[in-house]
Amino acid sequence: MRTPRFRIQAKNVFLTYPKCSIPKEHLLSFIQTLSLQSNPKFIKICRELHQNGEPHLHALIQFEGKITITNNRLFDCVHPSCSTSFHPNIQGAKSSSDVKSYLDKDGDTVEWGQFQIDGRSARGGQQSANDAYAKALNSGSKSEALNVIRELVPKDFVLQFHNLNSNLDRIFQEPPAPYVSPFPCSSFDQVPVEIEEWVADNVRDSAARPWRPNSIVIEGDSRTGKTIWARSLGPHNYLCGHLDLSPKVFNNAAWYNVIDDVDPHYLKHFKEFMGSQRDWQSNTKYGKPVQIKGGIPTIFLCNPGPTSSYKEFLAEEKQEALKAWALKNAIFITLTEPLYSGSNQSHSQTSQEASHPA
């Protein structure tokens, strides 16, 4: 009886080298140097120790196109430190995703190229999707989670990318980096008594602050130290020019908000901020509404002028009712002098308020 002729046609090839002590890096280099019908797109090598301690090597090779293998010695590899040659079992890989998952299970791997999603899996159905999403949640970061979903659930990656992107932003949300003031609060030695009293009563942690703190509006010329002073008081949200309440910028654990150089005519959520309101939502332009915990005071910083001053805005005839409300929820201070006296702050004050002229 004739021995069947060896022949494999496949776009993805799975190799197993039993009892093989070749370094996985050497095998990777060896495969890369082979002259093959189609160029490899991705190669992954895994070193696996069986229960008896013997090492095995597995390799997944993805090609640009389908190749035909008739030489069963094509992938025989010689150990770099001796003359021993190791012969692999050669198979076509029906699901490269499943093979890659198998190679990844022990973690002792090396790879080259970009893995090609094949969309096929021997483990079909809902459980496979659940496993994929569980792996994504355990990946540790948004980018890694998206890579897992792209690889294991490519249909969801394409059709649900917008929702996945938004949901993973929330799941792997990192709080904004804390601001470090260039000057301590104590260096501002010309702060009016009314402002100091407001700070003592309202800028406190959640356990000590009032249930509905008062806000404060501070109006004054540029380079009086308003911005740096306001940002030196403690953990805060800084909103300048426009409001970005996304989790990447806005921190619900902050002690207070600073709204700097925002025209009051176009200030979104005017009452929510000035009234220290709790548990409100803000619609975002391209995403889902964000939930704001609230209950913290806001420091409004502005310059004189019709497009900056809150006093001038509230003095408009059509804002009469809003003015009456605002006077019950905030105090209004006009600065005539800088908040500091020392010349040692002049350079940083100038550079800070040149960017934020409020």
UniProtKB/Swiss-Prot annotation:
Cofactor(s) listed: Mg(2+); Mn(2+)
Binding positions for ATP per the UniProt entry: 220-227
Region entry Oligomerization, spans: 155-175
Binding of a divalent metal cation, residues: 48, 56, 58, 106
Family annotation (InterPro entries): CRESS_DNA_REP (IPR049912), Gemini_AL1_CLV (IPR001301), Gemini_AL1_REP (IPR001191), Gemini_AL1_REP_central (IPR022692)
One of the GO biological process terms: DNA replication
EC numbers for this chain: 2.7.7.-, 3.1.21.-
Motif (RCR-2): 56-58
A cellular component term, taken from the record's GO annotations: host cell nucleus
Domain (CRESS-DNA virus Rep endonuclease): residue spans on this chain: 7-115
Keywords of this entry: ATP-binding, Covalent protein-DNA linkage, DNA replication, DNA-binding, Endonuclease, Helicase, Host nucleus, Host-virus interaction, Hydrolase, Metal-binding, Multifunctional enzyme, Nuclease, Nucleotide-binding, Nucleotidyltransferase, Transferase
Location of the motif RCR-1: 14-17
Cofactor notes: Divalent metal cations, possibly Mg(2+) or Mn(2+).
RCR-3, short sequence motif: residues: 102-105
Catalytic machinery residues: 102 (for dna cleavage activity)
Region (Binding to RBR1): 142-152
Subcellular location field: Host nucleus
Record family assignment: Belongs to the geminiviridae Rep protein family.
Subunit architecture: Homooligomer. Interacts with the replication enhancer protein (REn). Interacts with host retinoblastoma-related protein 1 (RBR1), and may thereby induce the transcription of host replicative enzymes even if the cell is not dividing anymore. Interacts with host PCNA. Interacts with host SCE1 protein.
Role this protein plays: Essential for the replication of viral ssDNA. The closed circular ssDNA genome is first converted to a superhelical dsDNA. Rep binds a specific region at the genome origin of replication. It introduces an endonucleolytic nick within the conserved sequence 5'-TAATATTAC-3' in the intergenic region of the genome present in all geminiviruses, thereby initiating the rolling circle replication (RCR). Following cleavage, binds covalently to the 5'-phosphate of DNA as a tyrosyl ester. The cleavage gives rise to a free 3'-OH that serves as a primer for the cellular DNA polymerase.
Protein name per its UniProtKB record: Replication-associated protein
